[in-house]
Amino acid sequence: ANADASYAGEMTLTDAVKWSKNTVAWNIYQQITPKTGSSFLIKMGFHKIWVDKDYNAGALGGFTYGVTTEEMAGGYAALANDGVYRKATCIRLIVDASNKTVVNETNRDSKVYDKSASRMMTQMLREVVLSGTGTSANVENAVVAGKTGTTNASKDVWFCGYSKYYTTTVWAGYDYPKEMSGVN
């Protein structure tokens, strides 16, 4: 369902993202096929995606086994990085005293999205922060893009966002599904 449980008629994709009109995401997911949509997530290390079980609900983030904040941050970081996914690590390179490489995580990048598609998505997500459901994440003198997400009865609440230098994902909820009052 749409975030506000209302139908708004035809609209731009930017407005659909900005106002969490999830029926638009559902329709696009059906057009590109769930198999294609899920393949992008799998390329970015979403390890618990079951294409056969999560087929249609995947358009709205409804996955049988859920996703982690690390997986979500990696997905959004790929958008911030012009479509290039980089596996999260706190160590990129270690070289010993004799200049021998001990650990090298610098060449693990993989292109997931076209640069132009990533930049268009960033523009849409920028609108979410400027004047949509994510205005609380707007930072003065910084370019921030992101998306809010809320499950039915606010059992889970998400914000995933990024700037030029940082990507973050915030999840609020309980270990066992329980409504959080006063959350929007």
Predicted segments with their positions:
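Active-site-adjacent helix/loop patches that line small-molecule binding or acyl-intermediate pockets
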Residues: 2-48, 52-81, 126-127
